């Protein structure tokens, strides 16, 4: 396994172009199996989660053709199975979107329980199951495989989600697309990638209204047809690079963003003392002087995203004063705190609250990523720290960040991906 080696303490300058949204891509790719025709999808981030999904579709018999670095064609017309139980499915959480897609197309599904980031224990799918059952499917889990039987027909209904689950909202939308009648999802998730999925499905012939609000209405159609779609920019990737500037200093133009999606993030960075300016579909962030303490609580969109909580916390380790970070979405999302303490951070965690007392400097150290966003937080800390930081388990990071080493190098960062046995001295020489 390779690792990242970062020689920190250098401010970041230049431009970074944001890739397509990973969270949108991993919902749209499974949706393509419902389409009777060829889907051409642009602005796909070629991160490991996406590559795994594309390989799953190939295993299932779909035609998958990579046109260029960010464009893929998917042809599911030859797909004749509703079973996805290989080990690949267990490697990523979003593989469970195949349940809704298979139910929509075949009225049945067998899908292996998913993997992915391991914070918070096993991610529950009870809201997914509740939604499928309300549509008329019989659900059970056998030997780690989710089995769904909708052979008696799926019928539209009203579904109220106990929590505004992104995963459940996606899965129910997929299953309801070709159900009989109208389905109404109340307390639906409102994240940008929910809207993007709805726009994709509508462009293929679905009838979905209200995505982006807490009530989504889906009127079932008889079939979806092929077409072209371009995925939105990645809100979380953009926020990660902005948090890196807040930590390390400098001035960076973050290109290819939707500024409205960034409001909750830019507000907190401005509160810390960063200068923020919007330029069409670009945002410039500048941090020259010291940053300041803030309080932040993660919430469902349009609140501050849980997927940016670790990265912001890393930047707050160097802010003046004592900051308070409250996690309002997931359990056990402060596992990165032990690694930041190895670098000199003063961070104390009590349940869902982290209290961060800013320090004058962080010091490079060997650390280990425990999940995708925790790994991004360690990269940010390493960029700002004095000395050398070595990050192991970088596979987590590459699940969600396309070309992260190359993008950071273009901003002036001294970061390398090296073989695990290679010394930092050799990496520096390269």
Q: What are these regions, as identified by a protein language model?
A:
Residues 1-430:
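Short, structured segments at the rim of ligand-binding sites
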């Amino acid at each position: 396994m390779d690792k990242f080696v970062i020689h920190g303490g250098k401010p970041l300058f230049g431009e970074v172009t944001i890739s397509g949204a990973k969270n949108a891509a991993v919902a749209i790719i499974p949706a393509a199996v419902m389409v009777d025709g060829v889907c051409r999808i642009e602005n796909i981030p070629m991160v490991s989660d996406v590559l795994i999904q594309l390989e799953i579709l190939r295993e299932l018999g779909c035609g998958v053709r990579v046109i260029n670095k960010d464009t893929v064609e998917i042809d599911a017309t030859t797909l004749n199975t509703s079973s996805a139980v290989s080990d690949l499915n267990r490697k990523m959480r979003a593989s469970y979107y195949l349940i809704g897609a298979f139910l929509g197309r075949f009225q049945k599904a067998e899908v292996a329980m998913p993997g992915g980031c391991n914070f918070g224990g096993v991610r529950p799918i009870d809201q997914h199951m509740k939604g499928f059952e309300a549509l008329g499917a019989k659900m059970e889990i056998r030997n780690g495989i989710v089995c769904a039987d909708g052979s008696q027909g799926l019928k539209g209904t009203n579904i109220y989600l106990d929590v505004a689950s992104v995963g459940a909202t996606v899965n129910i939308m997929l299953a309801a697309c070709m159900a009989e009648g109208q389905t109404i999802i109340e307390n639906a998730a409102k994240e940008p990638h929910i809207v993007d999925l709805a726009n994709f499905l509508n462009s293929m012939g679905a009838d979905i209204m209200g995505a982006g609000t807490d009530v989504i209405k889906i009127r079932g159609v008889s079939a979806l047809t092929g077409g072209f779609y371009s995925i939105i920019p990645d809100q979380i990737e953009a926020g990660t690079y902005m948090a890196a500037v807040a930590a390390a200093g400098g001035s960076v133009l973050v290109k290819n963003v939707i500024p409205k999606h960034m409001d909750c993030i830019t507000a907190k960075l401005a509160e810390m003392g960063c200068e923020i300016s919007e330029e069409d579909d670009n945002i410039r962030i500048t941090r020259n002087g010291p940053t300041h303490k803030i309080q932040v609580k993660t919430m469902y969109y349009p609140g501050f995203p849980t997927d940016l909580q670790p990265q912001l916390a890393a930047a707050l380790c160097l802010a003046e004063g004592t900051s308070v970070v409250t996690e309002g979405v997931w359990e056990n999302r402060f596992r990165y705190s032990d690694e930041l303490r190895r670098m000199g951070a003063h961070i104390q965690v009590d349940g869902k609250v982290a209290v961060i007392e800013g320090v004058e400097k962080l010091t490079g150290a060997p650390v280990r990523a425990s999940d995708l966003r925790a790994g991004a937080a360690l990269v940010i800390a390493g960029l700002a720290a004095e000395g050398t930081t070595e990050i192991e388990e970088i596979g987590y990071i590459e699940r969600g960040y396309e070309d992260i080493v190359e993008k950071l190098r273009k901003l002036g960062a001294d970061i390398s991906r090296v073989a695990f046995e290679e010394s930092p001295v050799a990496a520096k020489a390269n």
